[in-house]
């Protein structure tokens, strides 16, 4: 996987397009959503094995701004994967806590536009990745995944991603020695209100 990641990073620097940005974020969301031991922290470590401290830069400067480029049918599964990254990766909650608010804000803006999961797949999904030989790696990961991976994020996140985010934040308190509150205080009120409603419904308190 490291050679694939390196090729992706070269493409991001040399000839980034909106199409490639969308597929790159989709790829990261897919990896973070894999229901396997050690994920999504393994995704962070994969990037950091290429260059120390790299994933924090990718999260803040690539994933966060490019989430908005996702088409409607790609939003649900990708958002669910990024929520896992925000709440189940020790590095995101500690080493890369500075990048956490920007990524959280982006995923919450995405949730405001995201309805129930759309299961239709069109033939051009992944075309830009395929041009670089990345689609083969994507397909390899998908075929090696569990049945839970294959049926999509709804099977493990449920149909309501706000509720899923709230529950995951409750669990994230065990990974972060400091309070989550300072991170959430950096989120604008218009999106934080929606999250607070979900926290109340799920009986989760962030102190």
Positions of predicted regions on the chain:
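Alpha-solenoid helical-repeat scaffold
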Residues: 1-207
